[in-house]
Amino acid sequence: MYSFILDCTTRTAKKVKMHVIDIYNKYHELLVFCRQQLIQKNFEMSKSNAVELYSKRQDEIHDEYQKRKRREIKVIKSDLIELRRQKDEVIENMKTFKHDVVKYKKLYEDLEQEIKILERKNKNLEIETNSDSGNLMVYIANIENILSKCTNKSLKRNIEKQLYKMDEIAYKLKDNFREEFE
C-alpha cells in the first residue's frame, strides 16, 4: 500500500516516507499496546470472574451445607419428639405395670394365704373323711344287708334311692380329695 513511498528518492518524499514509517510504527506500537491491555484486561476480568465464580460457588456450597444441616436438625428434632412421646408412653405403661404388679402380687399373696388355709382345712377334712368315708361305706353296706331283708317294696325303693345318692356323694368326696392332694 505504501510501497510507492519506499521507492521515492526526493527529499520531501524521504520526509514523507519517514513520517509514514513513524506513523506505521506508532500504529503498530499502539496496536501491540492495545492488545496487551486487552489481554491484561481479559486476564484480570477472567481472574475477577474466576474469583467471583469461586466465591459464588463457595456461597452456594455453604448454603447447601446449611440447608442440609437444617434438614438434619429438623429430622433430629422430629425423632427427638417421637422418642419423648415414646418415653412418656413407656413411663405410663411402667406406672400401669407397677400398679398391676402390686395388684397381682397382693392377689397372689391372698391366694397363697387362702391355699394355706384350705390345705389346713383339707388335711383336717381328709382325716375326717377318710375315717368318715370308710365308716360311710360300712354304714351303706349294713343298710344294704338290712334292705335285702325288707319286704315293703316302696320303702325298699326309697331307701335304695337314698343309698344311691349317699354312694355318689361318698365317691365324689373321695375323688375331690384325691385331685386336690395329687
From Swiss-Prot:
Q: Which UniProt keywords apply?
A: Coiled coil
Q: Coiled-coil annotation: which residues?
A: 66-133
Superkingdom of this entry's organism? Viruses
Q: What is the name of this protein?
A: Uncharacterized protein R566
| Organism from which the protein derives | Acanthamoeba polyphaga mimivirus
